[in-house]
């Protein structure tokens, strides 16, 4: 989840969460423009990968764009979408911390329904809370699904992209440490190097981040200084996304609605900016399309202080991939193109 942190840990974004009715959650939204006839570009089978998407989808307004881009990416064999919790910030926002994962689950259902897919991906409940400590899993459908897929006799590379806290992947690892050499973690999160500090996705489960960083699992980290560069404007989204099917209209409308609400809620803060947004989750998709081999460094792993969230040295031979650049236009234009191809404007 892209988080433009405005003034440190005390200032944070707030998502407007309106629970869906049972009818809204279960009704398939048919549209005259559908993805059922979508003919994606050909991708050699040997280049395809297996993928789980872990997302705090109702936290604000950008996860939805990354979900749609990933689903429309022919390189990806999507094995499931996992709704992740954001209970720590829900508590600070005086919201029901028990409900963050469920709200996200309903949002994923809505997005997938509006896409009108011939074969929708599986959707899994994630953990309702952050893990209690670095040794105890929060067992969930999502964590168990990751383990089951990872332990299959399948040589196709398996990735888990975490657009929010990394709770469910950490829980999967704690349930079955053998998955460490079978899964690559791609995480949108963590503060800027070298110091680090408070960052939204990290704040929602620092213990989970430490579990994965300390493990033998390969990690690709896209920290805040990089993911925040995925800038677009509401005008560009209106022009390139809104005309394309019910899903395009929804992506635009839900962002406008959240922008209006958050701007009125926090009139003295410099977020939202009013006419622009950073689609900070989408790099999790684009680095799997193209690794940006000159945009990262393999560096010694650090872990996170549980109180101030700064980076701490960790005695280990492990190195992780840390991105210092992801191409914003490649990332965004790929999404725009796929939406336009799948849902031609009338």
Which residues make up each language-model segment?
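Bacterial N-terminal signal peptides that target proteins for export
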Residues: 1-8
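Bacterial N-terminal signal peptides
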Residues: 9-17
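N-terminal acidic, glycine/proline-rich low-complexity segments
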Residues: 23-346
């Amino acid at each position: 989840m892209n988080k433009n942190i405005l003034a440190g840990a005390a200032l944070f974004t707030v998502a407007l969460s309106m629970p869906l009715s049972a009818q809204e959650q279960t009704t398939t939204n048919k549209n005259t423009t559908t993805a059922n006839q979508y003919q994606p570009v050909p991708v050699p089978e040997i280049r395809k990968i297996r993928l789980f998407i872990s997302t705090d989808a109702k936290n604000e307004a950008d996860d939805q764009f990354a979900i749609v881009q990933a689903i429309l990416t022919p390189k990806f064999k999507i094995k499931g979408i996992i709704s992740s919790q954001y209970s720590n910030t829900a508590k600070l926002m005086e919201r029901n911390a028990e409900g963050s994962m469920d709200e996200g689950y309903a949002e994923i259902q809505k997005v997938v329904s509006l896409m009108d897919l011939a074969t929708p991906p599986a959707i899994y409940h994630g953990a309702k809370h952050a893990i209690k400590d670095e040794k105890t899993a929060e067992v969930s459908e999502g964590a168990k699904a990751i383990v089951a897929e990872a332990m299959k006799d399948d040589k196709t590379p398996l990735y888990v992209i975490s657009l929010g806290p990394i709770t469910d992947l950490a829980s999967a690892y704690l349930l079955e440490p053998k998955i460490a050499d079978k899964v690559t973690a791609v995480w949108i999160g963590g503060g800027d190097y070298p110091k680090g500090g408070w960052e939204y996705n990290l704040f929602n489960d620092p213990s989970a981040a430490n579990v994965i960083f300390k493990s033998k699992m390969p990690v690709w980290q896209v920290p805040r200084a990089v993911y925040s560069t995925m800038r677009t404007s509401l005008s560009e989204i209106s022009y390139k996304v809104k005309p394309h099917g019910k899903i395009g209209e929804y992506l635009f409308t839900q962002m406008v609605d959240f922008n209006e609400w958050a701007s009125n809620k926090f009139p003295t803060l410099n977020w939202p900016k009013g006419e622009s947004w950073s689609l900070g989750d989408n790099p999790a998709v684009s680095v799997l399309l193209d690794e940006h081999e000159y945009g990262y460094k393999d560096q010694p792993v650090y872990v996170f202080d549980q109180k101030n969230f700064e980076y701490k040295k960790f005695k280990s031979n492990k190195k992780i991939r840390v991105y210092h650049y992801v191409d914003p236009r490649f990332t965004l234009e790929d999404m725009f193109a796929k939406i336009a191809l799948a849902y031609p404007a009338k």
